[in-house]
Amino acid sequence: MKTRLALLSLLLSGAVPVWAQAPFFQDKTISVILGGPPAGSADLRTRAVINVLRKHIPGNPTILIQHMGGGGGRQAANHVYKVAKPDGLTIGSMGAALVTNAILGEPGVQYDIDKLIYLGTPDSAQHYLFITHGDAGLTSLEKLRAASNVRIAAQSVGHPIYITGRVFAYLLGLKEAKFVVGFTGPEIDVALAQREADARVSTGDSLIRRNRDWLDKGLVDVHASIEIPKGERHPRFAQVPELASFAKSDRERKMIEMFRAFRIAGQNFFLPPGVPRERTQILADAMRKTLGDPEFLKEYQKLSGEAASPLAAEALEKVIKELPRDANVVELFNKLGGADPLPGR
């Protein structure tokens, strides 16, 4: 009787009991601010996530993408951090540059990566390979390290593949390596085949997908790899030396750790500081369910051409917090990302 009277009193007062309240996100629209252009790889990865994320958020809100590609994604990150209301209705999506730009002190960064709220990433693992064309005659690591003026093809100064090539060349101790830039990704393969370049960096999966015959016919030599995360070897290249084994100092080892952490950060999904804890938890839980959803895994493979390698919110936050930030390591990484000759060791 008392329970009935209490319920009647509640209804007459106009208050809505907690169990009867609609989910916060019901009939709402979430804007995903993407630091990249339409139809690019970041766009495809982001779409693979949001196509499934909606069903895991109570209330099934509408989710729309807004592209902000200016400043290599910095405009998007700055907007989420400084402009967006911290109400859970704005989510940022940006590649590893979100973390890289902040740690390396790039101009135009107006956000603090330690204050952003991370939801997770669908893209945390990668296996980079340093390969040379068979016609270059660099059939062993010893011959590669003894050679001078090895021509390494890449897209542009500062591009992730360019920086990765410089990291390989530096730690392998290549003599006066020459970086030939100005290619698209597919054009690098053509440049290698037509002997306009001797070497390139590729991911293991991309090499198998695009140029399996190069491997099957022994047309290229694979000299070293970078495992991301550490210890996770690509089954096809398990016997290839890992680049960290060539580090000579603690500074160089930390530089490799920094490189790994930058890549593990992958396609970050994040919130501005100050989003209420309850809404943050709802979105983090929804992202966790999405990243483990078979529908998402299939969608990601279809759109990106690669298998997803998800990392949930807590693990992603841990990677970023533990990232080496020593000034001398940052200085070395910045030199490797630039256009000047490789620094001495």
Per-range role (PLM):
Residues 28-38, 143-161, 197-198, 221, ...:
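Short loop->beta-strand "edge-of-pocket" segments that line small-molecule binding or catalytic clefts
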Residues 122-134, 151-169:
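Extracytoplasmic ligand-binding site segments that recognize negatively charged/polar headgroups
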Residues 89-92, 109-129, 151-153, 221, ...:
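A structural signal for short loop-to-beta-strand junctions that line the ligand-binding cleft
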Residues 6-17:
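Bacterial N-terminal signal peptides
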Residues 37-39, 96, 133-138, 155-160, ...:
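Short coil/turn segments
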